[in-house]
Amino acid sequence: MSAVLAEQEAAQQALSPTDNRLVPRTELEAREVDALKANLVRYLDFEAQLLPGFRPLFREYEVGTKESVEYAGVRLAGRIDRIDVDGAGRAVVIDYKGSLSADYEPFATEGRPPAKVQTLVYAQVVKRLLGLDVVGALYVSYGRAPKVAGAYDGRVLETPHLPNMRYERCACPPEGERSFARLLDETEKRAASAVRALLAGQVDPAPAGPASCAWCPVTACLSRED
């Protein structure tokens, strides 16, 4: 692992700034890179427990660059960190994060839709684009305390294979409003509504979750959540 990290660190110098290269320019940034490498080494044991019946099919899968992809009534472009599949052709969409909050748990707040929808969007796109049976849309933190959040079909994925997850806030039942398929469809409907509002010039503050206002400097906002 140390050799791989050294190789990747050296390769950053040849990348352009538009490639989001990781090149420290100060002593503080150099220490941050060292901390990141230490976290990744510690993360290996956690990764070995994650989804043992699945294998990576795609890494850094680009969406909307070679083909036109529509989601919520508009063209979508992005990059999916990882798509895993099992022997039955079922797939899990994975996005890596440095840390995770309750906003990444779709059922963290009763009666409120998911605050973070990135992997839910990509899961719907993967179903359409690749024809895969997507059963999970996960966020995986590689930070000092690795954990998993997101949504998954509770009939397919087993809790021991999703370490450090609050399952009651993430598992989808087989049927009903909280089923995984229904969650993907409802998320797209919400996204379409938001797109229409933006195109109409409606930009009223509407916090999506408890942490949405954490870094907002507008303290006098009536919609602010503390």
Where are these regions (language model features)?
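Structural signature of nuclease core domains in nucleic-acid processing machines
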Residues: 1-226
